[in-house]
From Swiss-Prot:
<comment type="similarity">
    <text>Belongs to the TRAFAC class translation factor GTPase superfamily. Classic translation factor GTPase family. IF-2 subfamily.</text>
</comment>
<dbReference type="InterPro" id="IPR000795">
    <property type="entry name" value="T_Tr_GTP-bd_dom"/>
</dbReference>
<dbReference type="GO" id="GO:0005829">
    <property type="term" value="C:cytosol"/>
</dbReference>
<keyword id="KW-0963">Cytoplasm</keyword>
<feature type="binding site">
    <location>
        <begin position="302"/>
        <end position="305"/>
    </location>
    <ligand>
        <name>GTP</name>
    </ligand>
</feature>
<feature type="domain" description="tr-type G">
    <location>
        <begin position="193"/>
        <end position="362"/>
    </location>
</feature>
<feature type="region of interest" description="G4">
    <location>
        <begin position="302"/>
        <end position="305"/>
    </location>
</feature>
<feature type="region of interest" description="G5">
    <location>
        <begin position="338"/>
        <end position="340"/>
    </location>
</feature>
<dbReference type="InterPro" id="IPR005225">
    <property type="entry name" value="Small_GTP-bd"/>
</dbReference>
<dbReference type="Pfam" id="PF03144">
    <property type="entry name" value="GTP_EFTU_D2"/>
</dbReference>
<feature type="region of interest" description="G1">
    <location>
        <begin position="202"/>
        <end position="209"/>
    </location>
</feature>
<dbReference type="InterPro" id="IPR044145">
    <property type="entry name" value="IF2_II"/>
</dbReference>
<dbReference type="GO" id="GO:0005525">
    <property type="term" value="F:GTP binding"/>
</dbReference>
<keyword id="KW-0342">GTP-binding</keyword>
<dbReference type="Pfam" id="PF11987">
    <property type="entry name" value="IF-2"/>
</dbReference>
<dbReference type="Pfam" id="PF22042">
    <property type="entry name" value="EF-G_D2"/>
</dbReference>
<dbReference type="InterPro" id="IPR004161">
    <property type="entry name" value="EFTu-like_2"/>
</dbReference>
Length: 691
């Protein structure tokens, strides 16, 4: 919310600052001096009140101001005269009058400086004409350790400036990076149709790769008669003199990872579902990822040549997920195909072109190129190599390029067949050589005027990246949900549910979505059975969602990724607790008492029967350490089967207090004998969270 200084409003209303302060105090708006700030609501109130007297206001204000100033002058002269009379001289009267006038002059002189979002201590000192050492001392006193050439943010710089009596304005001028990223809208007459960019998704073994091969081979048979070598992560197919670009980045993991980085290059998604298996867990995941990205979808029902194929069953399952086929009165295009027997491939390609036509995909080829990195690697003999999809403009040999924090000049380009080319227009996938470093998938590629400028901008981006890392975007979590609702930053709470059985997923989904209210809508964007995976975390990061785990645990890699991406994972064993925690978070009543600290994980390699004791697990400690007094949970195939405490911990025949990573040990679990080889024993402690 913007704030207005008293003197600024007085100037706007053609009033003196003193007169405005008096009027504000009459309205119970407490201000101290002309530098005090007013909220937008207070400014609106004053403007409304004063605008009620349009004819007389200026004259009355001027009269009041003149009378006030005359009275003030007389009063000041009288005070100065009395003071000088006491000291016995006319000279003092004159001097005191001079002092009063000087003070008035100083009050009227308001020092204003304009500073950017970030600037160095030296730059701030130069703007205020003070010694940089003094600023450094003040910053150190605030706990900010800096040197003269280090950058500080606007907030800290403005606080320092105000201590020196400066009024600070924020520089709104956009830097070159922002201006570059802001693509000017194209004139309608310059736009030309471009090929659609298609991503193929689906459950493992449902025939994604086979379908892509069938599409490519059909095209090759028509064009070249012979084999084809795939050189880059995308391929171009020509149908009826129209091109379609297929991205070969497999699975929805890459799709979501790129979306999390702001790259949305896919125009159409082809969802592959096997006619015999039907909708599977990964199919549901893929559907949820596509819905979250709001991309058009075509369903390819594959393997229709099999005797067990049942396309109607697939359509029924899709309808239950909200994808009603066109022939059943819905909007989802379903195409029966067989990648193996080459059935329905032409029909699928025609449907893709039809959807592309409906989407009216256009771009301007007559301008400097912009695109997205879809793959990047360091290749022997070539250096940093990146596969780029050109989205607008035309990329040419010799162009100076910027992508993320890397820069360079296009030295060579190769198309999807490995053929060297000199230029690439919109929707063309090309392999580009000439980068200074390996860029990241999802980085935007921009052509700039010259390589020197590209290098400067890349260095600037590196600095900004470091600064942004320090001020990393706060992901939503249950603990701070209420405050974010109050601030208005959360209008919709996205949730991902992972549970041990499908019944729990459905029960949780219904119960959680019923908690929606006027302030915040709760939306379950994905629900599935099994352990929490890296894919779940990436979807949560891209959609700013909370992950709820019910009777399941996160995989080790997923847990590490969640920490890196600042994704909140909550684990429960009772449905009631899930509902109550979300309710409490929404009301601002959530009081976390304890947090779980993972100590270590051990794998059961053998099980021994000990007379009078029961089963003892022969274990190898995979990570961390196992403590004798720790709480443990037994995890079997990603699902928690038991929670309890360690009854005994031995190394060889000796009782020990702890066993470190990389060592073997014997673990006995209290009141639990159903331990099996391959089970994971996870040791943890509960620590109280200070409030």
């Amino acid at each position: 919310m913007s704030k207005t200084r008293v003197y600024e409003l007085a100037k706007e209303l053609n009033l003196s600052s003193k007169d405005l302060i008096s009027r504000l105090n009459d309205l119970d708006i407490k201000v101290k001096n002309h530098m005090s700030t007013l909220e937008d609501e207070e400014v609106d109130l004053i403007m409304d009140l004063l605008s009620d007297k349009p004819q007389q206001t200026d004259e009355i204000n001027q009269q009041e101001e003149d009378i006030f100033e005359d009275n003030l002058e007389d009063l000041e002269e009288e005070r100065a005269y009395k003071k000088s009379f006491k000291k016995g001289g006319k000279k003092n009267k004159k001097n005191n009058k001079k002092v009063i006038l000087t003070e008035e002059k100083q009050e009227d002189e308001i020092k204003i400086i304009t500073i950017p979002e970030f600037l160095t201590v030296k730059e701030l000192a130069e703007k205020m004409k003070v010694n940089p050492t003094e600023i450094i001392k003040k910053l150190i006193a605030k706990g900010i350790m800096v040197t003269v050439n280090q950058q500080i943010d606007f907030e800290n710089a403005s606080k320092i400036a105000e201590e020196y009596g400066f009024l600070v304005d924020k520089e709104e001028v956009k830097d070159e990076l922002e201006l570059l990223l802001e693509e000017a809208p194209d004139d309608e007459k310059d736009l030309q149709p471009r090929p659609p960019i298609v991503t193929v998704m689906g459950h493992v073994d449902h025939g994604k790769t086979s379908l892509l091969d069938a599409i490519r081979n059909t095209n090759v048979t028509m064009k070249e008669m012979g084999g084809i070598t795939q050189h880059i992560g995308a391929s171009v197919v020509e149908v009826n003199n129209k091109k379609i670009v297929f991205l070969d980045t497999p699975g929805h993991e890459a799709f979501t990872a790129m979306r999390a980085r702001g790259a949305s290059i896919t125009d159409i998604v082809v969802l592959v579902v096997a006619a015999d298996d039907g909708v599977m867990p990964q199919t549901v995941e893929a559907i949820n990822h596509v819905k979250a990205a709001n991309a058009p979808m075509i369903v390819a029902i594959n393997k229709i040549d099999l005797p067990t194929a049942n396309p109607d069953k697939v359509k029924t399952e899709l309808s239950e997920l909200g994808l009603v086929p066109e022939e059943w009165g819905g909007n989802t295009i379903c195409v029966p195909v067989s990648a193996k027997k080459n059935i329905g491939i032409d029909n699928l390609l025609e449907m893709i072109l039809l959807v592309a036509e409906m989407e009216d995909l256009k771009a301007n080829p007559n301008k400097p190129a912009r695109g997205t990195i879809i793959e990047a690697k360091l290749e022997k003999g070539k250096g940093p190599v990146a596969t780029v999809i050109v989205q607008n403009g035309t990329l040419q040999i010799g162009d100076a390029i910027l992508a993320g924090t890397t820069y360079g000049r296009v030295r060579a380009m190769f198309d999807d067949k490995g053929k060297r080319i000199k230029k690439a227009g919109p929707s063309t996938p090309v392999e580009v050589l000439g980068f200074s470093e390996v860029p990241e998938a999802g980085d935007k590629l921009i052509v700039v005027e010259e390589e020197k400028k590209a290098r400067e901008l890349a260095e600037r981006r590196k600095e900004l990246q470091k600064e942004m890392e320090l001020k990393r975007k706060q992901k939503v979590s249950l603990e701070d949900l209420f405050s974010q609702i109050q601030e208005g930053s959360v209008k919709e709470l996205n949730i991902i549910i992972k549970a041990d059985v499908q019944g729990s997923v459905e029960a949780l989904k219904k119960s959680i979505e019923d908690l929606s209210n006027e302030e915040v809508r709760i939306k379950v964007i994905h629900g599935a059975v099994g352990a929490i995976t890296e894919t779940d975390v990436m979807l949560a990061s891209a959609s700013n969602a909370i992950i709820i785990g019910f009777n399941v645990r996160p995989e080790t890699n997923a847990k590490n990724l969640a920490e890196k991406e600042k994704v909140d994972i909550k684990l429960y064993r009772i449905i009631y607790d899930v509902i109550e925690d979300i309710k409490a978070a929404m009301k601002g009543l959530l009081e976390p008492k304890y947090k779980e600290v993972e100590l270590g994980r051990a794998e059961v390699r053998a099980v021994f029967r000990v007379p009078g004791v029961g089963n003892v697990a022969g274990c190898y400690v995979l990570s961390g350490k196992i403590l004798r007094n720790a709480d443990v949970r037994i995890i079997r195939n990603g699902i928690v089967v038991y929670e309890g405490k360690i009854a005994s911990l031995k190394r060889f025949k000796d009782d020990v207090r702890e066993v470190q990573q990389g060592f073997e040990c014997g673990i006995g679990i209290e009141k639990f004998n159903d331990i099996k080889e391959g089970d994971i024993i996870e040791a943890y402690q509960m620590e109280e969270i200070p409030r």
